């Protein structure tokens, strides 16, 4: 194993339209097979639709949707004396964003609408209004952490 130390993290450049790193990260997660142009087209169209339906600025609406999906607690498996406990932990801010992006994309892909633009805009609108699959996932995660609060002393 190489001993040169940790590999430096690559800096993600902000996207050209909104000049936002968050948008750039979302587009990168949305992308399939290196087709960034297609991912950008899908995302920007979905954001325009979201802005029309909410009547807010597109970037502000997107950020609010992300904020509504961010988990604050999660459970991690921890082995103690042959038993595995689900230990509730606080989620680091960078992981909160990563999980929310991942969940929004996953739940928009599994929706029933036709075309990714309508799926994504519908999921973002639901997240903006505090409902939908991604918000439900966040609530389930919080519920799991709450149910396993008794094991919080195993935190490391």
Swiss-Prot record:
Coiled coil: none
Disulfide-bond pairs as recorded: none
Single GO term (MF): rRNA binding
CDD domains reported for this sequence: uS7_Bacteria
InterPro entries, alphabetized: Ribosomal_uS7, Ribosomal_uS7_bac/org-type, Ribosomal_uS7_CS, Ribosomal_uS7_dom, Ribosomal_uS7_dom_sf
BP GO terms, sorted: translation
Keywords from the UniProt entry: Ribonucleoprotein, Ribosomal protein, RNA-binding, rRNA-binding, tRNA-binding
Highest taxon listed in the record's lineage: Bacteria
Pfam families noted in UniProt: Ribosomal_S7
GO CC annotation terms, alphabetical: small ribosomal subunit
Protein family membership: Belongs to the universal ribosomal protein uS7 family.
NCBIfam families in alphabetical order: rpsG_bact
HAMAP family membership: Ribosomal_uS7_B
Subunit structure: Part of the 30S ribosomal subunit. Contacts proteins S9 and S11.
Protein role: One of the primary rRNA binding proteins, it binds directly to 16S rRNA where it nucleates assembly of the head domain of the 30S subunit. Is located at the subunit interface close to the decoding center, probably blocks exit of the E-site tRNA.
Entry protein name: Small ribosomal subunit protein uS7
Source organism (scientific name): Nitratidesulfovibrio vulgaris (strain ATCC 29579 / DSM 644 / CCUG 34227 / NCIMB 8303 / VKM B-1760 / Hildenborough)
Lineage: Bacteria, Pseudomonadati, Thermodesulfobacteriota, Desulfovibrionia, Desulfovibrionales
